[in-house]
Amino acid sequence: MVSTSSYQTTKSKEIFTAAQKLMPGGVSSPVRAFKSVGGQPIVFESVKGAYIRDVDGNEYIDYVGTWGPAICGHAHPEVIAALHDALDKGTSFGAPCVQENILAEMVIDAVPSIEMVRFVNSGTEACMSVLRLMRAFTGRDKIIKFEGCYHGHADMFLVKAGSGVATLGLPDSPGVPKTTTNNTLTAPYNDLEAVKALFVENPDSIAGVILEPVVGNAGFIVPDAGFLEGLRELTKEYGALLMFDEVMTGFRIAYGGAQEKFGITPDLTTLGKVIGGGLPVGAYGGRADIMAMVAPAGPMYQAGTLSGNPLAMTAGIKTLELLQRPGTYQYLDKVTKSLTEGLLKVARDAGHSVSGGYISAMFGMFFTGSPVHNYEDAKKADVAKFGRFHRGMLERGVYLAPSQFEAGFTSLAHTEADIERTLAAAKEVLASL
């Protein structure tokens, strides 16, 4: 464990101070600025396995995993070797490559809902594109999303969003016209009756329902029994589409994602993070008859200069090959169980009211004793206490997501020894809060 007396981040502070004159807020994505946990962010120098090293030489056990992609651990040697081989052939083609076919076949084989897939460059791009597709296929304009669920920063989704929007305490974003979000209906997550009411009020105008099947962008929140099943039934009843945003859960909570885990098959799915092995990537796919609407096969236009990038495809292929190996998800479940149950126990033993849980390689803990079923429940958590907890863990060599409203991630590189060190640090920090 790192000695708190020797912990310093002088170089990180200098770099971040300079960055604030060069980039808005000093970062390329808001949550990285540590606004919800106080202090200034650490600047990374390198990552390897379950560890990150900052520019001041401090080493941390990492439970952010570059926000989800690093399920095999950072800089996995087999992924790096595959990338070296691909790099010699060029960084970008802007044309078809065989790696697209290989990764597409792997995704289609793995994800129950996907019969055809289109690769893009980010989760935001995937969700933005699939929303257009839902509207094109149904001829309807309205969508239902859930409070606290985050589907990227496209205008139509910035209504009661989670992730960085929740971190900053913003209900939406300036610059988004009301006309853009007029067709975005919202309901509390896990509230099937609220969804039913929206369908009753708009029986012929809802194109579909979009959600994180397991919420990771308002903290870690699981679906109540019957919730996903109820959504599937409602969308079928009203002729609407069901879309799972599995950018975070895809290949993480099961090889086939949340839809495999819960046995509910949506019409469409978005993916990202894991399928790029740490490189920028996104994808959307679903039923062949719906995907046939996408250009150039159909009239719904969507394109991208770097889509299907050979390096991203290569990293994704090797990552999925690693995940196919026997015992992968059993191991992820084991280490995440030890971590999550251990954190909850040491927190409660120290007199703190907490709740939380995990599924495979995804977990979360809220500083509230009440069960968290939706975004409103999540907002009752003690954000200030989480900020102090985060800082204490950082000083002891443990890097957690810098927001109460983000899920945590484990990887195949995490060991039981890493978990023990983490719990020892947590015990020390929680005793002092």
Swiss-Prot record:
Its main location: cytoplasm. InterPro entries: 4pyrrol_synth_GluAld_NH2Trfase, Aminotrans_3, Aminotrans_3_PPA_site, PyrdxlP-dep_Trfase, PyrdxlP-dep_Trfase_major, PyrdxlP-dep_Trfase_small. This is Glutamate-1-semialdehyde 2,1-aminomutase. Belongs to the class-III pyridoxal-phosphate-dependent aminotransferase family. HemL subfamily. Its EC number is 5.4.3.8. Its cofactor is pyridoxal 5'-phosphate. It is found in: Cytoplasm. Coiled coil: none annotated. GO terms for cellular component: cytoplasm. PROSITE patterns: AA_TRANSFER_CLASS_3. Keywords: Chlorophyll biosynthesis, Cytoplasm, Isomerase, Porphyrin biosynthesis, Pyridoxal phosphate. One of its GO terms (biological process) is protoporphyrinogen IX biosynthetic process. The modification N6-(pyridoxal phosphate)lysine is found at K273.
